[in-house]
Amino acid sequence: MAWSFRAKVQLGGLLLSLLGWVCSCVTTILPQWKTLNLELNEMETWIMGIWEVCVDREEVATVCKAFESFLSLPQELQVARILMVASHGLGLLGLLLCSFGSECFQFHRIRWVFKRRLGLLGRTLEASASATTLLPVSWVAHATIQDFWDDSIPDIIPRWEFGGALYLGWAAGIFLALGGLLLIFSACLGKEDVPFPLMAGPTVPLSCAPVEESDGSFHLMLRPRNLVI
């Protein structure tokens, strides 16, 4: 089956959204949101995520400890937990709805109007998933920058810096945003083919019946069988 340009754009949007959703899940799990290198002990690196804090020592296994209380976390990490989990739910639900509402997948028992509404709702959820991914990652980055350049902290105290998970989170948000934009753009390419409604009654078979002309000659004419006398 040859796919239309509209279907290819929808497929590209779905793949980008799926990639962004996977990257967002990995970002949530990784502890490398912030890193801290100790000048007194260069062989030891501290890493902090939204779920745990770890100490990475060379030639020694990494030791991690989960945060004991949600309320004891900084405000940016509390918000990051909530929004990242919400992003996973919105992204997954948006992917499913966009798949059901796209031309890439055909379901005979789904009505066209209902399918179009599913696609519209899915595109909205994908855009929301992008926002709920970029916001917590950017907030944690902003808080890290503020603490790094805080003049009230003595220079001898080590400062937290960006971890690799922040860059992955930004990439996830961009992929989700691009996927959502492609899905929205596909809706503006043109109208979908609306299926014609089925006839209310059964189809009447045709038959030939003679018709008399004014000059006395006859010719055959197609008529419904139930109208032939």
UniProtKB/Swiss-Prot annotation:
Record keyword Transmembrane helix present: yes
Intervals, Cytoplasmic compartment: 1-10, 103-124, 186-229
Name of a matching Pfam family: PMP22_Claudin
Signal peptide coordinates: none
One MF term in the entry's GO annotations: structural molecule activity
Primary role: Plays a major role in tight junction-specific obliteration of the intercellular space, through calcium-independent cell-adhesion activity.
Family: Belongs to the claudin family.
UniProt-recorded name of the protein: Claudin-25
Name of the gene: CLDN25
